[in-house]
């Protein structure tokens, strides 16, 4: 299952287990955040209703981007200014989309084996 979420003025296509870099979100590394602004969700070619759907993600790290140099110059006026800027980012790992966890598939196989063992 995939979803399109909006955070920090940008849109991201995410699925369970993906890692994305977004604009800075409040929180410590290891904490869980919920991305509630889901624009689209689907499975393969089918689209699902996004009403009340949330995307759960874990904060992996708070980081800074590459340094961007801002250089201003006015020729023939001996005017030069050099400033640097590093944008703050948050690295997220998507845990689940709409309550559907990635780990739910493994217990389903265990439940299927249990009735087979009971019949034998």
UniProtKB/Swiss-Prot annotation:
GO terms for cellular component: cytoplasm; ribonucleoprotein complex; ribosome. The keyword rRNA-binding applies. Keywords: Ribonucleoprotein, Ribosomal protein, RNA-binding, rRNA-binding. It comes from the Bacteria. GO terms for molecular function: rRNA binding; structural constituent of ribosome. It holds the Pfam family Ribosomal_L21p. One of its GO terms (biological process) is translation. HAMAP family: Ribosomal_bL21. Part of the 50S ribosomal subunit. Contacts protein L20. Belongs to the bacterial ribosomal protein bL21 family. This protein binds to 23S rRNA in the presence of protein L20. This is Large ribosomal subunit protein bL21. It comes from Rhizorhabdus wittichii (strain DSM 6014 / CCUG 31198 / JCM 15750 / NBRC 105917 / EY 4224 / RW1).
């Amino acid at each position: 299952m995939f979803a399109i979420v909006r955070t920090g003025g940008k849109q991201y296509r995410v699925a369970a287990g993906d890692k994305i870099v977004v604009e800075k979100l409040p929180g410590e590394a290891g904490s869980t955040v919920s991305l509630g602004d889901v624009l689209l969700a689907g499975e393969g070619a089918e689209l699902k209703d996004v009403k009340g759907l949330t995307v759960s993600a874990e904060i992996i790290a708070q980081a800074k981007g590459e340094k961007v140099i801002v250089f201003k110059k006015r020729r023939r006026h001996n005017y030069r200014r050099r400033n640097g800027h590093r944008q703050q980012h948050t690295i997220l790992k998507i845990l689940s989309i709409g309550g559907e966890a990635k780990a739910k598939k493994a217990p389903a196989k265990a439940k299927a084996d249990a009735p087979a063992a009971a019949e034998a």
